[in-house]
Amino acid sequence: MTEQTAVAETRAEQRAGKYLTFALAGEEYGVEILKVREIIGMMDITAVPRTPEYVKGVINLRGKVIPVVDLRLKFSIEEAERTDQTCIIVVDVHGIEMGVVVDQVSEVLDIAGDAIEDSPTFGTQVDTSFILGMGKAGDKVTILLDICRVLEGDEHLVSPSGDATGDA
């Protein structure tokens, strides 16, 4: 076995596991289930001034203030009207809980390492560092996200105490 093959197998083993899948603009995405804290229905979101457009605001989840990011807007996808399927996935980003708005939660998939391919190269102008890989299940492809990288830089929306920050 070559060193390159061994590295590829180790990487495949590291990416293997359970993923919560969800729909966003008709495409299927997945996040590592260990990063998911809970799934909640849409609720009132309090807008926070002077935040990027994709930051919808904050919610009060059982007494804890959690920032909410709309993944459609984060990915430069047109905002859609909310439906009864629209929900918030609460994820752990470097020890901070954050909510992400998705169109619909699909299922939990157990994806083997050999069923995950590296993200295709789109050239130097396209950043794909937030994609763990492409999960193959049957004839469909699920884009597996590194949710920490997707939301990197957005942790500043809460302080370590979990209180909303903002310089209004």
Each language-model region and where it sits:
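An acidic, low-aromatic, low-complexity terminal/linker signal
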Residues: 1-168
